[in-house]
Amino acid sequence: VLDRTETVWGFRWMEWTADKGFFLNGKHLYLRGANVHQDHAGWGDAVTEAGMWRDVRMMKEAGFNFIRGSHYPHSPAFVEACDREGMLFWSENAFWGIGGFRADGYWNASAYPVEAEGRAGFDRSVKTQLAEMIRIHRNHPSIIAWSMCNEAFFSAPAAMDGVRALLKECVALSRQLDPTRPAAIGGAQRPLGKDRIDLLGDIAGYNGDGGIIPDFQQPGIPSMVSEYGSVTADRPGKYAPGWGDLQKNEAYKGLPWRSGQAVWCGFDHGSIAGSVMGKMGIVDYFRIPKRAWYWYRKAYRGVEPPTWPVEGKAERLVLTSDKHEGVRTDGTDDVMLQVGVQDAAGRDVSGNPTVTLTVVSGPGEFPTGRSITFSVDSDIRMANGKAAIEFRAYEAGTAVV
């Protein structure tokens, strides 16, 4: 025996329909979801498996049953967490555009190459990543769709024929590699008319105003609102969902033919478009919920929100950890440390003193090294009386912070 691997897999059956929505194991299920980027504050994309599980559980705790992996193949650990937590997952390929049609080198460059000499290599890369995503993740029962792209229409007009041709090739490849799951076109709300891309796959996801555009109402194929909301807010934000365009005709209430809807987005994240564009999460970059997260938890699970921090004098700090022992030191595990500010009566207050955490003894590090400082005017934020960071160690021992 030269090599051996074990894979854990499960049984389920699903059906996406054009007129009655989505069915799981024979029962109708409206997909209530969130888009999730997998980078974390301080650590970027170097996220531990524990951090990925924490993210999935936070979305589940809020009452969501669906995650859209935006907009690239997520780690196998993230998908395994979806399997074990009972979270349905839309796995997306790394072919996306963001708000523009400029030349290469700009953050809002054309999603598809403008120059002809770059197209063959780009096509190969997109199809290779799609094939690798399917082969790596295909045994995960949580995955209910393979998505070819997100908003690939953000391409120069001269490149749109190439976009359509590549999407057709990706759909064919997806069907060949896994005929049991539908091939989705994500962020397919443009263009309109005869040049539509939403009908190129088996299911369509519409972002933003795509959820209310007449062309995409009962489009003739299974569909969902793959993004709504896009509310920019620093924590704590408003105790409200931010339905965005879905508010205009009460589409947020759900339609019988629509399979579901996913908020943009679950967590704040890094963005090539700048920090403001990365603050649309219902949970902040450090994994502290904004008030919108509590709104969803109340709406979907009936759990009342906590008492909000009050104005008052900061008299003491409370340091908590999500676990205290049994933490692995192989780079796959971490602990979440949270600092809270209280007054003399033990009430949470909204004051924002500057706080420094330091490793006094033992192994372990923050993304900034052996100490980290939170302040109100820093990217490492103390806000509304709270701050948090993930802490990890690569050697055994007892860490004292």
Predicted features and spans:
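Acidic/polar low-complexity surface segments
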Residues: 173, 182, 368-380
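Residue-level signal for well-ordered, solvent-exposed loop/turn and beta-edge residues enriched
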Residues: 27, 345-347, 386
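Active-site mouth of glycoside hydrolases
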Residues: 1-203, 207-221, 231-235
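Short, aromatic- and glycine-rich surface loops/edge beta-strands on solvent-exposed regions
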Residues: 1-2, 307, 397-401
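Short, hydrophobic beta-strand segments
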Residues: 376-395
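Substrate-binding clefts and catalytic carboxylate motifs of secreted carbohydrate-active enzymes
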Residues: 127, 140-147, 154-187, 196-198, ...
